[in-house]
Amino acid sequence: MKKTTIFFTLIICILSFTTISAQAKFEKEKTEIGIMLDGFNVAAAKADFNTYFNYFAEESTFIGTDATEVWDKKAFMNWAKPYFDKNKTWNFTSLKRNIYFSKDGKIAWFDELLDTQMKICRGSGVVEKINGQWKVKQYVLSVTVPNDVVDKVVEIKAPIEDILIQKMKQ
């Protein structure tokens, strides 16, 4: 009986340690991703083109606030280059960030509320650990709209987006 109790106590201790160790690993990874995303935002604010785009994986996608803005890395670089060259980039600061992991810990996804020149926006995306570094695979920037003013926003954007909707349906 004593041996059985000791055996099960030992098993419980090992399982507890494994769970705590996995949680600690993800906390370390969350910190790394948070630092990476903050650096990503600072590089844009400083108009540091090379540093900013180095945060993206070679095969990555940027999805902007306009319905037509879906770019691979090269296309996004081409679009953004004039803004970086003229020092007319964006300055985003994270207000609240959530980070989640795949079971194997190689992929993470995040959502965050950002303080921007457009007021509160939402950044979300997928990051992958590539050669020991977290890289952005997909980034989505969305303008948040308070529910109380959605009808007014829809009224303003309807003439523009009705045309786009018709083009996309063809």
Residue ranges and their predicted role:
Residues 122-150:
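Short beta-strand edge/turn micro-motifs at domain boundaries
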Residues 61-71, 82-89:
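A short gly/proline-enriched turn/hairpin at secondary-structure junctions
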Residues 1-26:
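Bacterial Sec-dependent N-terminal signal peptides
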Residues 98-101, 142-144, 165-167:
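Glycine-rich beta-strand-turn "strand-cap" elements at beta-sheet edges
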Residues 19-54, 58, 147-150, 154-170:
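Short, low-complexity N-terminal intrinsically disordered segments enriched in polar/charged residues
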Residues 40, 52-53, 60, 76, ...:
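Hydrophobic pocket/interface hotspot
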Residues 56, 66, 96, 103, ...:
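A mature extracytoplasmic/lumenal domain signature
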Residues 75-120:
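Surface-exposed, charged secondary-structure patches
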